[in-house]
Amino acid sequence: MSHVKNTMDTPLNILHTWKGISLQEEQTTLPNGKTITHTTISHPGAAVILPIENNGNIIVINQYRPSLKKWLLELPAGTIEPNEPVELCAVRELAEETGYSAETMISLGQVTPLAGFCDEIQYL
């Protein structure tokens, strides 16, 4: 059941695009009937991998994030390419970021970490 609807008859107003991500603006009617202009970051989604070694150790990567101007320990992850299955993205990102390959892949579901202003879904 959808509680929010797009009231525009025309496509979204694309304010900016970069590397498959776009900043979009649209008129939206909220559940209380109020119409607002809402800005959303549109993102193609990402695969996030929780790599666990046979001995139980979890593999993380140390990655510099310019937006925060600091190093962070993170799970391997990456943006899903157009028409790429999530599982293939996970395999690709695990190899690219860690050099590891997985014996088994198990889906742990999905999260939407920035749902207030971004439509990115992260598949675990």
Set out the residue ranges of the language-model regions.
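Extended interaction-bearing regions that mediate binding to partners or small molecules
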Residues: 2-16
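Conserved Nudix-box catalytic region and its N-terminal flanking loop in Nudix hydrolases
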Residues: 2-4, 41, 47-92
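Glycine-rich, charged/polar anion/phosphate-binding loops
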Residues: 10, 34, 109-111
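Acidic, metal-coordinating catalytic segment for phosphate/diphosphate chemistry
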Residues: 12-48, 53-54
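Active-site segment of metal-dependent pyrophosphate-handling enzymes
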Residues: 22, 44, 52-54, 65, ...
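Conserved hydrophobic/aromatic beta-strand scaffold that supports enzyme active sites
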Residues: 23-27, 60, 124
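Gly/Ser/Thr-rich helix-start
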Residues: 34, 79, 117
